[in-house]
Amino acid sequence: MRLNLSSQIVLNKVPVEFYKPKTTVEYSEISRMEKIHTDIFASMAEGASHVADKIEAGIKAAQQEGKFYVMALGAGSSLYSVYDELVRRYNEKTLSFRNVVVFNAYEYYPLQKDSSLRTINQLKERFLDHVDVAEQNIFTLDGFVAQDAVQDSCRLYEQRIKTFGGLDVALIGIGRSGNIAANEPGSGIQSMTRIILIGNTSREEMENSEQTKETIPPCSLTMGIATLLSAKSIYLTAWGEEKAEIMQKVVENSITDTLPASFLQTHPNVHVVIDLGAAHHLTRIEHPWLVTSCQWSDKLVRSALVWLCQKLGKPILKLTNKDYNENGLSELLALYGSAYNANIKIFNDLQHTITGWPGGKPNADDTYRPERATPFPKKVIVFSPHPDDDVISMGGTIRRLVQQNHDVHVAYETSGNIAVGDEEVTRFMHFINGFNQLFADSKDCIISNKYKEIKTFFAKKKESDFDTRDILTIKGLIRRGEARTACTYNEIPLDHVHFLDLPFYESGKIEKLPMTEKDVEIVRALLQKVQPHQIYVAGDLADPHGTHKKCTDAVLAAIDEEKKAGAEWLKDCRIWMYRGAWAEWEIENIEMCVPLSPEELRAKRNSILKHQSQMESAPFLGNDERLFWQRAEDRNRATASLYDQLGLACYEAMEAFVEYKPL
């Protein structure tokens, strides 16, 4: 069973020569916008293996010379794949770490006794406890030191590094604000190991990624920029689309102290190692026509023309031969003969993505429509990772499908219980206890006792405590109620609302369990029961908690199993991927766009507002300060505005989709 099919989704196939040039000359040409040596790999696994190769070579070279190999190690998640690869090599007895000295790059401060937040513990759990680094060769900053001794402790750390001859390598990740180790924006290039206040962006990122509910301390003790730059070599890793924007700034923009990682441009032996997702906004990947000749696919042509329109502030049909020639797109003139021909081609392509009939228009020519006319009506399943992703991402389309008489089912894949605040449980428990008092004279002892039990638990609950199973069940029940209310508002029958409660989610923690065949079989059973003509599935694979990806993998694996079994229903089924909760589709990838009127957008907002537990007090709103309904409206309006700017019809908002073809 293939459980990771989402990782094989390639919307824009990047030619290998763009990220893996064959010669130094080719690399120099295609990377001329880049100020740091950057190695791009097709996947995280390939990139991690490359870094591990370099680390292994350094360790073995030092062993042959009878020297220590001194490493500064970060504890960020982008390094986990590298650590896993190094551990694998140790287990296969091809690599020993007996001569390695480790210095932890940063530590939280101040730490409470028995704190689960210690970054050195994370390093040990992920890497050091699984290899043969001598305990006496592992050094970390002291998160427990008294405040008046912090500076002395930091100076001592610098001295210890020097006693081993300095750092041979620094292996680090990068934060959303461009921070390396814990060096926040504003850090100077001369900064040494010191105490530093954790910035708001870094704090949000930590709170979303740390597998604990313990409060993040206000400060960090960190190696300074100068300390990191003193290393003989530096490897910075980043994976996934969520790191694409910051990596473009670090690699291609000028040095600035507002972007600490940009100081790496001054180092003679620094290597940025990223995958295609993190490289997405680099010029050679996103706008390759500016640095090299291109193989012009339809998507790349569309991307280039949209870029040109935005740069010049013109609609597509007003672009001229001069515009093409002056902006690096003369190849398109040779390919199409004139700007007019290219303009018409892309204008029509975009026009054909727009449809007010997401389920297909009956008795109509569907030659240029994104969805086929028959069968009509269609059986539809909308898979929603959490109990509100359906309305956030495609609430307008769902209402349109229902109004056009399609048989719409909604499948909520997870309970979403950990995303409900304690005050919501308290409010509902007050209600049910009051109900018991009013209508049962408090005679229902189960309700009375459970009310007291939960009230006592919340009164004594610490931030590091996890909820009991009963409380998680109640939180899941709250979200079920909200989902049913939203479906009723959208006129979806309650017997068409399915709560799958996939087991991988039920860890009670931010970190979920692995997605397994058990999850897939639950999804597959629903597919076999409904046998849909249309499936809508989350394509928001960059969500910060990873739930969307696992949910999508479960659906794609179930479809894959049905395909292997020769299921007849799948032969007449189309699968559409939506976004909206965390990002929007790039216009070159959009294959169906459903316009919304002002009234329809308001109805979509009302659907989202039915999920009251996910408003201001929701625990996991992510790094975006806007509420989910605001994000959804802004993204939908932005899509409509872009179509308008390109010279197409002007709508209030639009929901975009990309078709998935089973691999």
Question: Where in this protein do the model-derived segments appear?
Answer:
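Ligand-binding beta-strand-loop-alpha-helix segment within the catalytic cores
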Residues: 21-35, 95-169
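Histidine-anchored nucleotide/phosphate-binding helix
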Residues: 82-93, 390-415, 419
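ATP/nucleoside-binding phosphotransfer catalytic cores, i.e., glycine-rich phosphate-binding loops
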Residues: 2-12, 25, 30, 226, ...
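Glycine-rich N-terminal segment of FAD-binding domains in flavoprotein oxidoreductases
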Residues: 64-92
